[in-house]
Amino acid sequence: MNLHEYQGKQLFAEYGLPVSKGFAVDTPEEAAEACDKIGGSEWVVKAQVHAGGRGKAGGVKLVKSKEDAKAFAQQWLGKNLVTYQTDANGQPVSKILVESCTDIDKELYLGAVVDRSSRRIVFMASTEGGVDIEKVAHDTPEKILKVTIDPLVGAQPYQGRELAFQLGLKGDQIKQFTHIFVGLAKLFQDYDLALLEVNPLVIKKDGNLHCLDAKINIDSNALYRQPKLRAMHDPSQDDAREAHAQKWELNYVALEGNIGCMVNGAGLAMGTMDIVNLHGGKPANFLDVGGGATKERVTEAFKIILSDSNVKAVLVNIFGGIVRCDMIAEGIIGAVKEVGVKVPVVVRLEGNNAELGAKVLAESGLNIIAATSLTDAAQQVVKAAEGK
């Protein structure tokens, strides 16, 4: 689950980290009022969406009057912001963050993730702030500094000082950076985060450090023990199909292809997507119905896949272990009848009751293409999607 920038900065402030004075507003009038509350003669207004690249898309602007702040809010509230990280429809803007203006001398990067290989929280810092950190990691990996946090003792001040020295900070900046580093590490652990970024972490003209941005992603598996963060969830930023899938305990991720995929098991689902790509197709989704799939969940999975107008064909790839193939077959038949499927459906069944499942499908009288292997299934569904 992601948080908006203004929500992330609220958490930063609770941990004593330096952030800009600002207000998240819902109306153009509130945007103008926020300028009065903040004071000064210049403000930064930011559209709040769960996506990067807002600045290049016109979603971040420096304004020099209350009227301009109000006009910006009128321009974006209720509209969708399209960035390089969104799909063609963009993300809806329901809040605008109005902040005081910051005089920047230098931009740094500071972030943290859970490193699966070491099973530790790893902090990353770089002098290349304000840019895409993935690009820095690819082009100049030597510019990214890393520190691993011991889960037994947590982040230590000496680790913060070491990073500060390597970033070229001096004097009070070292103390400030260490304070920010330790605070972010505590926040990361307290709230079960999966990712945290301050990009950029800036050195102001007066030499002080300042958190100019906040990106926070929470481990969804830990939300049951984070009621405060659950309350911060903005459902408007979720893909409607993904939200519906979550209610049925289905793992669904929307993609941009035209071949719908329904598979049991995350590994098999990824393998299925790979082989579809290998044969020239483009998956429209990742969908794992799980090991404990029921007929009802399979029916809902089918509905979710077919709710995507881009889907030209559907591939169902089931390996029956815990899940019986005949039950999956009944779910497919039920969904096809209920939804009124108008696209080709290719089914590959293997394992528990696979022969019975194939028989159920064959006797259904529906136009379902049976595949003999995974390769055959991929080839057939790619042809079907192309109308061949």
UniProtKB/Swiss-Prot annotation:
Binds 1 Mg(2+) ion per subunit. Substrate binds at N264, G321, I322, V323. Pathway: Carbohydrate metabolism; tricarboxylic acid cycle; succinate from succinyl-CoA (ligase route): step 1/1. Gene3D superfamilies: ATP-grasp fold, A domain, ATP-grasp fold, B domain, Succinyl-CoA synthetase domains. It holds the Pfam family Ligase_CoA. GO terms for molecular function: ATP binding; magnesium ion binding; succinate-CoA ligase (ADP-forming) activity; succinate-CoA ligase (GDP-forming) activity. Transmembrane segments: none annotated. Keywords: ATP-binding, Ligase, Magnesium, Metal-binding, Nucleotide-binding, Tricarboxylic acid cycle. Its EC number is 6.2.1.5. InterPro entries: ATP-grasp, ATP-grasp_succ-CoA_synth-type, ATP_grasp_subdomain_1, Succ-CoA_synthase_bsu_CS, SUCC_ACL_C, Succ_CoA_ligase-like_bsu, Succinyl-CoA_synth-like. GO terms for biological process: succinyl-CoA metabolic process; tricarboxylic acid cycle. One of its GO terms (cellular component) is cytosol. Its cofactor is Mg(2+). Residues 9-244 form the ATP-grasp domain. The keyword Nucleotide-binding applies. The keyword ATP-binding applies. ATP binds at K46, G53, R54, G55, E99, T102, E107. It catalyses: succinate + ATP + CoA = succinyl-CoA + ADP + phosphate; GTP + succinate + CoA = succinyl-CoA + GDP + phosphate. Mg(2+) binds at N199, D213. Heterotetramer of two alpha and two beta subunits. Succinyl-CoA synthetase functions in the citric acid cycle (TCA), coupling the hydrolysis of succinyl-CoA to the synthesis of either ATP or GTP and thus represents the only step of substrate-level phosphorylation in the TCA. The beta subunit provides nucleotide specificity of the enzyme and binds the substrate succinate, while the binding sites for coenzyme A and phosphate are found in the alpha subunit. Belongs to the succinate/malate CoA ligase beta subunit family. PANTHER family: SUCCINATE--COA LIGASE [GDP-FORMING] SUBUNIT BETA, MITOCHONDRIAL (PTHR11815:SF10), SUCCINYL-COA SYNTHETASE BETA CHAIN (PTHR11815). HAMAP family: Succ_CoA_beta (MF_00558). This is Succinate--CoA ligase [ADP-forming] subunit beta.
